[in-house]
Amino acid sequence: MAVAHRLASQGATGQGYDTFVLAARRSRDLDAQEADLRKAGAGTVERVEFDADDVDNHRAVLDDIANRHGPLDVVVVAFGILGDQQRAEQDAGHALGVIHTDYVAHVSILTHLANLLRAQGHGQLVVFSSVAGVRVRRANYVYGSAKAGLDGFASGLADALAGSGVHLLLVRPGFVIGRMTEGMTPAPFSSTPDQVADATVAGLRRRRDVVWVPAILRPVFAVMRLLPRPVWRRLPR
């Protein structure tokens, strides 16, 4: 929502967007989010019921939005679950649930979106990966492996979209202090949702391929990739 808020604020100055579609589960509960967007400058805000795990319905949801609102300019794909690593190590069903939401469902919606935006000849896609997928750690390897898959898929999709008029921005945040990580001790180089949103909007404006949040994580993980495996294995999250 922080990204949408900034895009709405830009729209109020004539430099952004006026119409926003919030696609989410329990979309009827998004009164506060809709009011926030309108206050920021959005002219039209619509809510659409969307269950990311219901991959069979992805195409229908997107077609309905496009048919009613016309070409899509910016699509921010922002859903996922952290899961419980300890449970996932014992419960294959839970592990598969994390993989399905964080990877499989993304492959589905991004494939449909890529085809839709290609047909338009323009548009921007925002995909949220994570540094957890840059090098997967013992502490959260189920979630990390899903993010690693998503990162690779999005990177390849961005290359496939080159020359089509469609731009894909891949965002790699570190630990984000927010609802998903509530109750957890922040990791080094943590960021807030506002900081992630600022970096994302700047990346869209500059048509960047990849944005690390915070930027220092890029050189940090360049080194992390080279650590010997026995050392890496002992690192905390």
Describe each region flagged by the PLM.
Residues 130:
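Residue(s) in the substrate-gating loop at a strand-loop-helix junction
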Residues 37-56:
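Rossmann-fold cofactor-recognition segment
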Residues 170-171, 185-222:
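C-terminal helical subdomain
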Residues 1-20:
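Canonical Rossmann dinucleotide-binding motif of NAD(H)/NADP(H)-dependent dehydrogenases/reductases
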Residues 110, 146:
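Active-site helix of classical SDR
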Residues 135-141:
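Active-site loop immediately N-terminal to the catalytic Tyr-X3-Lys motif
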Residues 80-96, 139:
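Conserved mid-core segment of classical short-chain dehydrogenase/reductases
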